[in-house]
């Protein structure tokens, strides 16, 4: 039965589209986050660009707004035809400085508050301007609803295992050289940074490195929206059947929690509060951390007891079980999304 609202227009359902690219690459983790939102939608009538939420929309559209916002603060506030559920929301400090200069943006978020935030830093940023919030955790923790598998293979996946090194390397590449290089050379140049097998010897045994299949969440931006979502779902199905996943991507690690796939988050010293730590506080609390750093140092950094493993402490034939502390958040996220769609 079609739902209608007071205006008499049929209610439509939207899903985020992620076209923004970094040096010609897009992060498939954004699409994985939207796969989590898609689970709760009765259908998808249209795709809405995440960084152009003020685009033309001709009918009321329900949409779950989870993920990283806003790299394009000039495009806020969103179109009033959008009926949003703000959940698992992340806002970068630099973006917050810009977006909260306009009172209409603050008023917009207040209208749809409380805002579910996936990390503690976002809570602080919103509370500072009077927007009520709660800690929701990440919606990808619900992906087991659709993508879990009863099959468990012997595959080990190394998914951007040293992402912070990759990120720094990419950011240091000369923009001029990237622009002037032919496309093929450009991709090969980036590939040198994005497949760092030689860099992970200090974290993983050679046997695991040899067995592991490398997966990169950065993919070429010339793919269509449909192709990107197909790839995201392909990765989720891989992770669901894996014996072990080792990654420094939170939107690989969190889905693995949901899929009951043993996962180790490789932490190699992301100390920049604005760029990295802000994303991780509240998230890494619920997963196993693989690091060569001293456990006490990690606990002090996060201000609490964390699930920390040194490579030498791991039985690689029987990886440690995932913590279960995320499950209560996943249940609450599921209930909120289902209630949003029904009402």
Give the positions of each predicted feature.
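Active-site anion-handling motifs in enzyme catalytic cores
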Residues: 1-343
């Amino acid at each position: 039965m079609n739902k209608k609202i007071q205006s008499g227009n049929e209610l439509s359902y939207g899903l985020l589209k992620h076209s923004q690219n970094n040096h010609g690459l897009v992060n498939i983790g954004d699409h994985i986050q939207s796969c989590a939102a898609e689970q709760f939608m009765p259908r998808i009538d249209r795709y809405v660009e995440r960084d152009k939420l003020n685009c033309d929309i001709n009918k009321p559209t329900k949409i779950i707004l989870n993920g990283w916002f806003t790299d394009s603060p000039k495009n806020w506030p969103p179109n009033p035809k959008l009926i949003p559920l703000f959940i698992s929301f992340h806002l970068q400090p630099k973006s917050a400085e810009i977006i909260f200069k306009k009172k209409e943006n603050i008023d917009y978020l207040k209208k749809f508050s409380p805002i579910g935030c996936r990390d503690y830093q976002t809570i602080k940023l919103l509370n500072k301007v009077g927007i009520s919030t709660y800690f929701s955790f990440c919606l990808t923790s619900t992906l087991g609803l659709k993508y879990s598998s009863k099959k468990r293979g012997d595959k080990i996946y190394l998914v951007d295992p040293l992402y912070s090194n990759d990120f720094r390397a990419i950011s240091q590449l000369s923009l001029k050289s990237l622009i002037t290089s032919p496309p093929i050379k450009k991709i090969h140049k980036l590939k040198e940074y994005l497949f760092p097998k030689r860099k992970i010897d200090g974290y993983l045994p050679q046997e695991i490195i040899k067995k592991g299949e490398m997966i990169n969440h950065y993919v070429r931006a010339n793919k269509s929206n449909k192709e990107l979502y197909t790839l995201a779902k392909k990765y989720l199905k891989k992770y669901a059947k894996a014996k072990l996943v080792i990654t420094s991507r939170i939107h690989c690690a969190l889905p693995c929690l949901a899929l009951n796939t043993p996962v180790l988050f490789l932490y190699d010293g992301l100390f920049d509060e604005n760029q990295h730590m802000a994303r991780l506080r509240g998230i890494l609390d619920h997963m196993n951390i693989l690091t060569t750093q001293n456990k006490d140092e990690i606990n002090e950094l996060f201000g609490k007891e964390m699930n920390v493993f040194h490579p030498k402490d791991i039985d690689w034939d029987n990886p440690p079980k995932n913590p279960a502390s995320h499950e209560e958040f996943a249940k609450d996220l599921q209930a909120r999304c289902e209630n949003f769609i029904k009402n």
